[in-house]
């Protein structure tokens, strides 16, 4: 069984737009470290790693709570238990493609609710139930990273969440 090594970082971005003229932007980087993976089908290396911070998005305390969240350049598939698998792809310099899949849940006012997501073009739109205090998009399961077997080097995949 072949194994390969690479350094991987998951870049998580949250973009909150409060008005047409003012924007609040925050970004955090989660470093997954040097990773080893299993070669699948002689073409893809699969790596499973748990992000250090499970919170992908948290609504700002000073801003109005959103009615929906938009994840740019992503795909969504339903998962059991009211969760959704969100996959984000990143083009690589050698014309290959890396992807990360996160099993996500939606927390509204501290309680887990069923995540309702739909595909809208290249984006995923998550409908948020009415909330009083806070909204969180989180992943409590390990992330699955897939890269071409020929790829070597650092890797950053941006997960951009807008409200």
Curated annotation (Swiss-Prot):
- The reply on keyword Translocase is no
**Principal place of residence:** other
InterPro entries cross-referenced by the UniProt entry: FaeF
User: Any keyword Cell inner membrane?
Assistant: no
Keywords associated with the record:
Fimbrium, Plasmid, Signal
Signal sequence span is 1-22
Q: Where in the cell is it found?
A: Fimbrium
Q: Gene Ontology cellular component?
A: pilus
Job of this protein: K88 minor fimbrial subunit, plays an essential role in the biogenesis of the K88 fimbriae. required at some step in the initiation and/or elongation of the K88 fimbriae.
**Any idea what this protein is called?**
K88 minor fimbrial subunit FaeF
UniProt gene name: faeF
